[in-house]
Amino acid sequence: MFDRIEDAIEDIKQGKMIIVVDDENRENEGDLVMAAEKVTGEHINFMIKYGRGLVCVPMTEKRLNELGIYQMVENNTDHKETAFTVSVDYKECTTGISAFERALTVKKLVDDNSKPEDFTKPGHIFPLRAKDGGVLVRAGHTEAAVDLAVLAGLKPAGVICEIIKDDGNMARLPDLLEFAKKFGLRIISIEDLIKYRMKNEILVRRVAQAKLPTKYGNFEIVGYEEILTRKQHVALIKGDINKEPVLVRIHSECLTGDILGSLRCDCGDQLHAAMERIGQEGGVLVYLRQEGRGIGLLNKIKAYHLQDQGLDTVEANIKLGFPPDLREYSIAAQILKDIGVKKIRIMTNNPQKIMELSDYGLDVVERVSIEICPNHYNEKYLKTKKERMGHLILEV
């Protein structure tokens, strides 16, 4: 359905437009996207005529500050946090509204010789302030446009325009696919762009290493930090990991289960079972700081409250506005590669974890079950994971 990110990057490099689609649970829209330094009046005219949305120019915060172009409002209450700045025209424009004068303004925004006094405010081009870190920090069209320009080896700025149908409503995916076919444009998703960056960029660095004696044996503990978010994770290593395949457990943080002994989940029991087995056989345990299946500790407690009222763990997440599972495993894959592990036997009941690790280049040769006997408090939770989340659990 979607084109390859590599092909889209090549089109951006050649000055072509593509269509970028975001998540159906977000804005669920498609934008025409191209590199700002490649724009022409014909491109802007196409966007105005066929896209029909607002023509905007995503740029880095650094560049906007250099040009003295600041945010439109001090208190941004937009629910998607779209970071509009004051609109601008290039000083030599007449009205600034024509496709060709708008293209001129865009070109001057990315011209290294431009100065703050070269732009009048307000104008007819709407710069957008992209977040540092791009789609890995905010999964929006603003960040996607800048990321694509950078990946194409061009200046970090794009031109975007929403695609609106003839009847005035937003074009959704079926409409966008037809639009792409009609005009011969490639179409990609922000989700695929995120995966591409996670797979091809180094996003974690090793910070510290020490010996860690435990009741399950003597481990080596290695501390890692995510480069963009500063989030911290650890890996516990036991024995000779050069003998592949290596036994691996990737465990997501659960304060209530791992530390406080909660009976509502099987997390703590799984953690200790994994440490015991790795202590005996050798291997690696990666401990990821993605509490509550990625929603955080306080939201997890809110989800517990909803479960007390009768909702299951999936329904509780959705009620709070989250997907059933927000976890992702690209960082774990990068940690394992840094350690030197490529071929693994993975201790998990979660087939999604296996799929993601394979997508990120690890050779998963075996799934090792890690089932815990259910108790009165977590039986419904485990049954929900099996029936609604596809976990491979036999005991419930």
Curated annotation (Swiss-Prot):
The UniProt annotation places D-ribulose 5-phosphate binding at R26, E27, D31, R138, A139, G140, H141, T142, E162
Q: Where is this region: DHBP synthase?
A: 1-199
What does the note under cofactor report? Answer: Binds 2 divalent metal cations per subunit. Magnesium or manganese. Binds 1 zinc ion per subunit.
Record's InterPro entries? DHBP_synth_RibB-like_a/b_dom, DHBP_synthase_RibB, GTP_cyclohydro_II, RibA, RibA-like_sf, Riboflavin_synth_RibBA
Q: Which Pfam families match?
A: DHBP_synthase (PF00926), GTP_cyclohydro2 (PF00925)
Enumerate the residues binding Zn(2+).
C254, C265, C267
Gene Ontology BP terms: riboflavin biosynthetic process
Keyword Iron assigned to the entry: answer is no
Gene Ontology MF annotations: 3,4-dihydroxy-2-butanone-4-phosphate synthase activity; GTP binding; GTP cyclohydrolase II activity; magnesium ion binding; manganese ion binding; zinc ion binding
Give disulfide pairs as residue numbers. none
Where does the record place the site Essential for DHBP synthase activity?
H124, E162
Q: Which family does it belong to?
A: In the N-terminal section; belongs to the DHBP synthase family. In the C-terminal section; belongs to the GTP cyclohydrolase II family.
Descriptive protein name:
Riboflavin biosynthesis protein RibBA
Organism lineage string: Bacteria, Bacillati, Bacillota, Clostridia, Thermoanaerobacterales
Encoding gene (name): ribBA
